[in-house]
């Protein structure tokens, strides 16, 4: 999943929240992030409204990132060009005992990204790689 959390009273706005959470969870210093803007709000399965904020960092910043052990298992990159590939996103439908589930899976290297994170990436993909007329 992506770094994130609740708006705290100390946060000026949702961008400040995103930057604070990224610093707390993966040691990403706010000063090295170029904020590009927000994506569409997404409702989590628990009913929370999540406002994704998109930022860009330089490649050399990745080596400085450190996961907060109590919150983050690992940190990995997903090249933007990977989002444009037709085989990256898969729509999965699973039948459960009492209901069916449908969700996106983003396949990348040793990681499968799914759920809310995959929905956010799908929104980003649709904005970056819109069909040309």
Predicted segments with their positions:
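Unchanged
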Residues: 6-113, 122-133
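NAD(P)-dependent dehydrogenases' Rossmann-like dinucleotide-binding region
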Residues: 117
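Active-site-proximal cofactor/substrate-binding loop regions of enzyme domains
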Residues: 2
